[in-house]
Amino acid sequence: MSCDNKQALSGVTLAAIGVVYGDIGTSPLYTLRECLSGQFGIRAEPAAILGFLSLIFWLLILVVSVKYLSFVMRADNAGEGGILTLMSLATRNASPRWTPVLIILGLIGGSFFYGEVVITPAMSVMSAIEGLSLMAPSLDPYIVPLSVLVLTLLFAIQKHGTAMVGKLFAPIMLTWFLTLAVLGLRSIIQNPEVLGALNPIWALRFFAEYQTTSFFALGAVVLAITGVEALYADMGHFGKNPIRLAWFVVVLPSLVLNYFGQGALLLDNPAAIANPFFLLAPKWALLPLLVLATMATVIASQAVISGVFSLTRQAVRLGYLSPIRIVHTSEQESGQIYIPVINWILYISVVIVIMSFEHSSNLAAAYGIAVTGTMVLTSILFCSVAKNSWHWPTYLVAALFALLLAIDVPLFAANLGKIFSGGWLPLTLGAVMFTLMTSWKSERFQLIRRLNEHGNSLEPMIASLEKSPPTRVAGTAVYMSRVVNVIPHALLHNLKHNKVLHERIILLTLRVEDVPYVHNVRRVCIEQLSPTFWRVVASYGWRETPNMEEIFHRCNAEGLSCRMMETSFFMAHESLIMKERPCAANCLCCCSATPCAQRISSRSRPIG
């Protein structure tokens, strides 16, 4: 590898540390504390401490290092990852009988993310600010207001973008991980026998000694791997190799050292279970550590917020959510977006969660069920891709599937015990999002079917207009067309009421493919239907934003002369009324909310 390539890899790896690992990197704030908090009847005694440490270590190895970094990240769609991407890959070569099942599983996984995203910022920030109570117990009543204040500021700056502060994420998170390592190593040196927990025999002894209780305790152990989906979801931003390098060189060693450092502290002083993370530090370092922890949790929250923006955009592009306003906060980076309605719904939800649960330990009961549910679904979809798309041998896929579920299912089952103590929250939010996505997709499908069944066929209508032409006016008219073989409703409406047509008519259809990017060579397909009618189909990936100037440029390059200032745009607001369904008034063609429509709104004529 050349020197320049090494420098580029180092830079991207550092950036990945700042974005990808924020959630899983702040888990040491609360994981071991929740494992030994007494909620499972397990005290901070040596067998339990070493057992939990062994479980945490081997979960990091098996789930993160093996499952996600070694297997799941192989499944990319032009370099992109994430649960909806995995769903698209799984359905490409699946049998028609299984395709609807795989789509439902993918949508459930995406819905789980919406459920968990409300908890992550609240849990992370509260865990950091709770360090105040160690410095001055009298400050304990201010933890909730301060947590709300920090998150209010974070959500308020979203509309301005995070390009400037984003440059600080990597050095702050690198400092955070180095601090984790130093604090943990300092404690391990004082009590090195804690390293015995690297032996998986301690995990087996833990199950043997605590039996049924140990199973439910897995619900707390799983807190160590929350955020693991970010490794796969952010693959398109940073690439596989930088994410893997960051994990094995920086993140994994730092996490292991810190967890084992907390364990060494607890072996010497079980009373430190009140907050083992902050008690690792000397008293003089508590305030700097509190500030650093707060910054790290804010960065972790930012990564989650950006993730939900990206997932929402992908769902909108793929037709699973209504078109909504998406603001690009950076002219250079297309991935930096802001969705106002999602931002403020998420903010209100997070504030309600903080004020309702009041302490991170209470919130921990709601944490993990959506993460483990997504892990199970990821395993199913990945094995489907391996079998149907990569044609791995059946015996190999079956063995891998059994191995993955042997880890994922117990973790998910252990978290089901949290349903009545807070786990209902992410499940309820996920159920709402799943209902919205499936209802929207279903109604959109029915609208397309109605348009095909009852709309005027394109070719006969054009032939009739050419044979008996109405009055023509100078210029070009672009009619947005949802269905390529049907005359747009806006054109019929214009012809009926105005009795005229422009001298050139372009029927434009925007098509979103299930890939992140479409090559420019395939961007525009032009077909001349008659001397005055053209059909243009513009294809985009779900990560791209339709651009009318670009479409016109491609049309000009292929011989169809188009000038923006001499063109009028017509759109129809179509809706399907479902009288017996709760979302009866849903409008399925909110053109004004689409990015392309926003760019041409000043020259458009909404009709119908």
From Swiss-Prot:
For this chain, one GO molecular function annotation is: symporter activity
Pfam families named in the record: K_trans, K_trans_C
Gene of origin?
kup
Give the UniProt family note.
Belongs to the HAK/KUP transporter (TC 2.A.72) family.
Query: Which keywords annotate this record?
Result: Cell inner membrane, Cell membrane, Ion transport, Membrane, Potassium, Potassium transport, Symport, Transmembrane, Transmembrane helix, Transport
The UniProt entry's GO CC annotations, sorted and at most eight, read: plasma membrane
- Transmembrane stretches, by residue range? 9-29, 46-66, 99-119, 137-157, 165-185, 213-233, 247-267, 285-305, 337-357, 363-383, 396-416, 419-439
Q: Function, please?
A: Transport of potassium into the cell. Likely operates as a K(+):H(+) symporter.
How does this protein sit in the membrane?
Answer: Multi-pass membrane protein
This protein is called what? Probable potassium transport system protein Kup
PANTHER family in the cross-refs: LOW AFFINITY POTASSIUM TRANSPORT SYSTEM PROTEIN KUP, OSMOTIC STRESS POTASSIUM TRANSPORTER
The record's subcellular location field reads: Cell inner membrane
Biological source species:
Aeromonas salmonicida (strain A449)
InterPro entries under this entry? K+_transporter (IPR003855), K_trans_C (IPR053952), K_trans_N (IPR053951), Kup (IPR023051)
Catalytic activity reads: K(+)(in) + H(+)(in) = K(+)(out) + H(+)(out)
